[in-house]
């Protein structure tokens, strides 16, 4: 688990387990290791990123989607757009590292279906909803605002295309 908010001397300000940041970190670190192509770093860090993905799968993957976070041990079951996008890539990445672990590929496919069913706003020309309740009901938030843009979902699409092309 990563810490996410700090004071000026790097003390954690809040007891927050950010599931989205952890799954995002798992694949971004692996991508960085791929680019660096340094076996020493890969040997040290690849097992850690695998553990992160496994922990997120076990702790936060519920009903074909990833919960938002846990503050002081209490889960926020909201499903946030960027977390679902990062989860698709993170679980594909975990499957690519361990092709025998079909649960990760199945989870990535299930999260994609969840996104299509609940997060994609069906109105023509629209975007993904910011977030939905655990039951898939959209929560009223702007479709686009300073913290909500197609960065994560766009990157997810590009990563999935790249990774599936590499796999074939």
Place the predicted regions along the sequence by residue.
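Glycan-recognition and catalytic cores of secretory/periplasmic carbohydrate-active enzymes
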Residues: 1-168
């Amino acid at each position: 688990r990563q810490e996410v908010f700090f004071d000026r001397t790097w003390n954690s300000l809040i007891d927050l387990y950010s599931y989205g940041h952890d799954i995002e970190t798992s694949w971004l670190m692996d991508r960085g290791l791929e680019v660096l192509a340094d076996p020493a770093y890969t040997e040290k860090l690849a097992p850690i990123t695998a553990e992160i993905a496994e922990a997120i799968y076990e702790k936060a993957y519920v009903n074909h989607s990833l919960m938002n976070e846990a503050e002081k041990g209490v889960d926020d079951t909201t499903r946030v757009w960027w977390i679902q996008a990062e989860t698709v890539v993170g679980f594909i990445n975990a499957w690519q590292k361990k092709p025998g672990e079909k649960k990760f590929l199945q989870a990535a496919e299930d999260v994609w279906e969840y996104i299509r069913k609940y997060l994609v706003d069906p109105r023509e020309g629209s975007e993904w909803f910011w977030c939905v309740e655990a039951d898939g009901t959209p929560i009223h938030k702007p479709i686009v605002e300073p913290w909500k843009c197609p960065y994560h979902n766009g990157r997810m699409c590009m990563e999935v295309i790249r990774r599936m092309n590499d796999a074939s």
